[in-house]
Amino acid sequence: MEQFHLDREEILLLAKASALQLSEELIQEYQTSLSAVITSMKEALAIEIDDADSCESLFMHVVNVEDLREDSVTSDFNREEFLRNVPESLGGLVKVPAVIK
């Protein structure tokens, strides 16, 4: 299968959409690694599966219900103890920086 290649402009568009500032070194690195990921995905999508029923076991969950622990509520620490360890709190809650300006 043909190797897929992202060009520099596509990497810069992705960086802008992700609010990232990339050095020339990172642009080159991302071009190489993302192109390899896309090529691998195209190869995986090209695999033909003749009988979906025979492949069902490949997609089944590995963990059975018996393997899971029972949910139980515990009180490992109290609110005051927790809030003493945070940089800033307000009204008994953890105050975090605003994400949207």
Curated annotation (Swiss-Prot):
Keywords: ATP-binding, Ligase, Nucleotide-binding, Protein biosynthesis. GO terms for molecular function: asparaginyl-tRNA synthase (glutamine-hydrolyzing) activity; ATP binding; glutaminyl-tRNA synthase (glutamine-hydrolyzing) activity. It holds the Pfam family GatC. The keyword NADP does not apply. The keyword ATP-binding applies. It catalyses: L-glutamyl-tRNA(Gln) + L-glutamine + ATP + H2O = L-glutaminyl-tRNA(Gln) + L-glutamate + ADP + phosphate + H(+); L-aspartyl-tRNA(Asn) + L-glutamine + ATP + H2O = L-asparaginyl-tRNA(Asn) + L-glutamate + ADP + phosphate + 2 H(+). Heterotrimer of A, B and C subunits. Belongs to the GatC family. This is Glutamyl-tRNA(Gln) amidotransferase subunit C. It comes from Chlamydia pneumoniae (Chlamydophila pneumoniae).
